[in-house]
Amino acid sequence: MRKHLVRTAVVVVPITFCMLVSYVTLGGQTPAAPKFKYGPDWPKPLPNKWKMGGVTGLAVDKDDNVWVLNRPNDLVSIEVHQEQDPPLADCCVHAPAMIHFDKAGNVIESFDAPQGHGMAVDKQGFIYIGQNTVRKYDPKTGKVLAAIPHIPENANGQPFDNNPRIGWVKGQGGAGPVAGFIAVPNADGGRGGRGGRGGGRAGGGDGAATQAQLQQSAFIAKYPPTTPMIVGGIEEIRTDDAVNEIYVADNAFGGRVMVFSLDKFEFKRGWGAYGHKLSEISTKPEDHAYTPNGPMAKEFVGHLTFNFSNDGLAYAADRTGNRIHVTDKQGNFKLEIKLAEYTGVGGSAGGVMFSNDKDQKLLYISDLTNNHIWFLDRKTGKVLGSMGQMGESGGSFFGVHMEATDSKGNLYTGEVFAGERVQRFVPADSPRGKLLEQLSRVQP
């Protein structure tokens, strides 16, 4: 584990005024960063010659078993040679999109589903997958049981697809999981792709760009941020079973936190950056723009993930905005935590998890660009340390995307780039952690 000199700041919102605080010293006792040991025995090798794609969902159920949502479409042709007729190699085939592992790392069940992003499991064991909306699945059969309402069309004018198909084709691979993040020079010298932060004009010249802007303006006028349905796609899902609610990060308008009833999927409330009411969310592109090390955007920038703590606070991580916004569950703004503001490309503030102590004193933030898990003091937002670096060996990361914790304090991670795997890290002070430390000291 390494400690980093990272500039962090928070915006604290008392009742009557706002204040920017840069942390130098803090009164009271600051919690220490946790220490973990990589567990090489979890998971076990996948059965049936499966090859997992990029991990886009990770959740621990009530029995401490782990559900993994992966993207089979991420595999390239060389990874699915076993699917050719006749097979070209001993391995591999596309794995099912949903894989259920037990505590020992064995696959206990699986089912296929259309490609998605964001996943949750409720106390009854039902699965919720983010696709072009949120769909509820029976984990035993893989059957869709219900879906959160979505507007009847997409931003491009095409009808909304109520029954998306499984996207991969047997024996065929795609461009790979990193392709969308590679910045390709445009004719004007700008750089497109996700890595360019939208910095390149669409092809077809000014006329095509103007037409696209007009189409977008008409779409927003028809479906403004106050729309009580899903407008875009899904980034994150969390269930709050105790109060019969499900939280969804809709990626429209840079990101909206949307809350629905868990049993009937009826809309209840929502908010944007700084706790903006849905009616206050700006649709101006400049209000969603962010440059690394620059001023924070007025609205969410993009790729919003979400979680809530036991004491009723909600944490919305604006990944490409390099920050986390803390509100209560009604959307009242409390705190802005800035994280590794220098980070470009995919941003620094990914998944949000908490330490498993009673007070959940620590935040665990996954960072697919810097390939760290950041450990923050939840009360202040101060960075206490980090774990991981870019690499392909066990315990390293290449695109660490998703994270989850179990009741024992074990930390699970999922990678979306060439890592395309899940890993488990155990607390260093646990019996297993101490044993792993002893084994690491044994000379070959």
Predicted regions: what they are:
Residues 398-444:
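Blade-level signature of beta-propeller repeat domains, shared across WD40, Kelch, NHL, RCC1
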Residues 28-29, 160-224, 444:
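Disordered, low-complexity segments in secreted/periplasmic proteins that are enriched in proline
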Residues 69-93, 214, 249, 258, ...:
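Short, conserved, GDST-rich strand-edge loop motifs in beta-rich repeat architectures
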Residues 65-67, 126-128, 245-248, 313-316, ...:
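Conserved beta-propeller blade signature
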Residues 24-40, 87-88, 207-209:
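Blade/loop signatures of beta-propeller domains
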Residues 40-82, 233-241, 245:
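Beta-strand-rich domains and repeat architectures in extracellular enzymes and scaffolds
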Residues 51-61, 94-96, 113-126, 154-172, ...:
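Beta-rich, blade/repeat-based domains predominating
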